Amino acid sequence: YTTLFRSNGGKEHYMKRVGFLTSGGDCQSLNATMRGVAKTLYENVEDVEIIGILDGYKGLIYGNYKKLSPRDFSGILTEGGTIIGTSRQPFKLMREPDENGMDKVKAMKNNYTKWKLDCLVILGGNGTHKTANLLREEGLNVVTLPKTIDNDLFGTDMTFGFQSAVNIATAAIDNIHTTAASHGRVFIVEVMGHSVGWLTLHAGIAGGADIVLIPEIPYDTDKVVDAINKRTEQGKKFSILAVAEGAISKQDAELSKKDLKKKMKMHPSISYMLGAEIAEKTGQEIRITVPGHTQRGGIPCPYDRVISTRLGAEAAKLIIEEKYGYMVGIKNNEIVPVPLKDVAGKIKAVDPKSSIIKEAKAIGICFGD
């Protein structure tokens, strides 16, 4: 239907009113993705109005939005964050009333109707997609886009924001090399990723980390220590560990949630706990570096800008064709619609038996298993 696929280059002659919503943790390329949707709609629909629902689902619940114009999407391709704000609204609380007893799901449906929306375009990660699917089940027209630096959304090979975060985490590891070598220290670089290790795995390989610890492969502390001692025996004065914030030892994986929480309270994070254990067993000097939220910030890398533009254009095509209830994903470098019901509630984790793990081990990276 769009001019991209029509020989006459004409526009569709009907009104579309679309609401944009960004939810969950921010990341690079949110703005670039919204721009891709908006520019395609403006280019191919005669009469389109876009509103920005402010601060994620909170705006949809409490009725906060602003009208957006083509000018609002100018110059944001390289801008990090989100021009309409975001917030975290846990899915498990969505069906519970707020502190004033208001039915949140009913409120979202009412505002959708009140604003006379034809469709919601929702950008977010796992929790966001659960709520988006809930809204689909409630009869709202929804198209979603896969946002997360964790790259753990089911149904897509890649999420926007991931590659930009890989670049930042890799740079942190790169910059540690010289100081680690100069002082002969063991450095732990803690990378974001509570449940999955895609970011740590890619940054660890790209940054030349000696040891990579991810949630999907519980580690044996003694094997981590052995890997460090082996490097020392080989005359290598330093070691660098890339550790996911959700990494866990085999011993701790056996603990109850209560006992694990109690143990973790003694340390700021997993890296500090692991660092203390390594220092005790090796006698080496340990330093911890936590890039933290810098991994979410800054300008999106060129790769993210490209896939965001492509994803956005295809999302707009679905809206024009009135094909709702889909996430727009990437499969074998092609942009494809994936039924939202097949995505919500599922996580794409690193397979410990996958080729990338085997290849990393082949070059000598230790995973502590």
Language-model segments: which ranges?
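Short, small-residue-biased leader/transition segments that mark boundaries at the very start
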Residues: 1-4
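A cross-family phosphate/adenosyl-ligand binding-site feature
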Residues: 14-22, 33-118, 123, 127, ...
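Short glycine/serine/threonine-rich phosphate/pyrophosphate-binding segments
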Residues: 26-37, 60-61, 105-106, 117-133, ...
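A glycine- and small-aliphatic-rich helix-loop capping segment at beta-alpha/alpha-beta transitions
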Residues: 35-44, 67-72, 134-144, 160-164, ...
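Short, acidic/small-residue loops that bind anionic groups at enzyme active sites
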Residues: 45, 135-159, 214-220
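Accessory alpha-helical/coil subdomains and C-terminal extensions
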Residues: 111, 122-124, 130-134, 162-183, ...
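Short beta-strand elements at the ligand-binding edges of bilobed clamshell
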Residues: 155-166, 299-305
